[in-house]
Amino acid sequence: MFAVIKTGGKQYRVAANDVLTIEKLEAAAGDSIEFTEVLVIGEGADAAIGAPFVTGASVKAEVVEQNRGKKVIAFKKRRRQNSKRSRGHRQHHTVVRITDIVAAK
C-alpha cells in the first residue's frame, strides 16, 4: 500500500518503512508525527483519490534526525566594478521513517 502526502509545500509518494528527507518540522529525534494531508491512498485500481484530501486517512512516521542540506552559494558580481557579493545558505531538513499508513474507515 502506498500514499501520497503533502508536507512543506511538496508531495511525496511513500510506503511503509520508507525513509525520506522533508522540509524542517518542529520535532525532536525519536518523536512520532502524523501527516493528515493525504492526497492518494491505496494500491492499484482500488486507490482512493482525495478532493483535495482523503477523509480520515493519515500517515504515521517517526523522526530519525534533524540535519541541514548542502550549502548553496548566492554569488553576485558587477562586471568592471570590482564589486562582488557572496552569501551561503543551508536549508534545514528533517529525516523521517514512515511507520504506518492508515486508510479511511
From Swiss-Prot:
Q: Which GO terms describe its cellular component?
A: cytoplasm; ribonucleoprotein complex; ribosome
Q: Output the GO biological process annotations, alphabetical, semicolon-separated.
A: translation
The record's annotation in HAMAP family points to: Ribosomal_bL21
Annotated NCBIfam families = L21
Q: Which family does it belong to?
A: Belongs to the bacterial ribosomal protein bL21 family.
Annotated function: This protein binds to 23S rRNA in the presence of protein L20.
Question: Mind telling me what this protein is named?
Answer: Large ribosomal subunit protein bL21
Give the species this sequence originates from.
Rhizobium etli (strain CIAT 652)
Q: Encoded by which gene?
A: rplU
